[in-house]
Amino acid sequence: MAIQILNYIENKEKREESFDRVIQAIRDSLLIQRALLKVKELSDNNIHVFDYVEKDGGLYATVKSYSVLDYLQGILENEPYNYTLKCDTLNAISFGAPQRRERFIMVGLKKDLNIEYTYPEATFTEGSYRTVRDAISDIQDIEPGKEVTDSYFTLPPHPEAQGLEKELRGRCLHNHITTATRETALSRFKALKAGENFHDLSPELKTTYSNAERTQNTIYMRLKYDEPSGTVVNVRKSMWIHPELDRAISIREAARLQTFPDSFIFEGTKDSQYQQVGNAVPPFLAKAVAESIISILDQVQ
């Protein structure tokens, strides 16, 4: 590439032609650099290449495929990291959340600690699981706002509160907002009973969907008060419906299903707040795992 640049500087008459050659040389050099980085990535991660294929002017490496878990274990359990990994799937409902939400948890301890990690034991079982009613019934009569600026409400004292309500209820109610409901959506809300979803609607209420049969069962789901909810996602996009009222679930109601206390305030646009709630790990589940790790750290000290 240095030769092409020198020719470009010295040859004023053919500078345009030389410039094109310089650009091509730079492109070739970048392609080589990218290829070497890919080779380094394969080598660093012990990925076995068992064939190379030339196609469309490029060279493709065929590698053996394996799961993300195997990939992580292969790296973290060996030099230079040397972790002992424990993996399990925990359900938030077993730790006090009023929803069925499974999450894969991986905990790693340095091998030289010689300590065995044990996942936290469930504190709730079938028959004692918390429900949607436990989480949101006390704010049913508070009309949600429609804009982010409408999200502040003062909650009166509730000395009778107990269980989950007592754990989550605050003095102020933030983020209690929903989307404005259009006529078509409202007609669907009114048509659905607790536990029903989009597929239980009559054909005339499905006409705005190009492929209604492929719509997920979680769309237009009306929650059941006396059961745990399903996995909380972005309930605005899924159009989750209040168990008894013909309106969408508010951001705060979804946050309570996730076990966020009222004191936790979500910031950003309405869309962003709904997404933050849907993406989150339930604090009750996170707390259970964190406390189990703290007990390990106490042993180390």
State the predicted function of each range.
Residues 1-87, 94, 99-301:
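S-adenosyl-L-methionine-dependent DNA methyltransferase catalytic core
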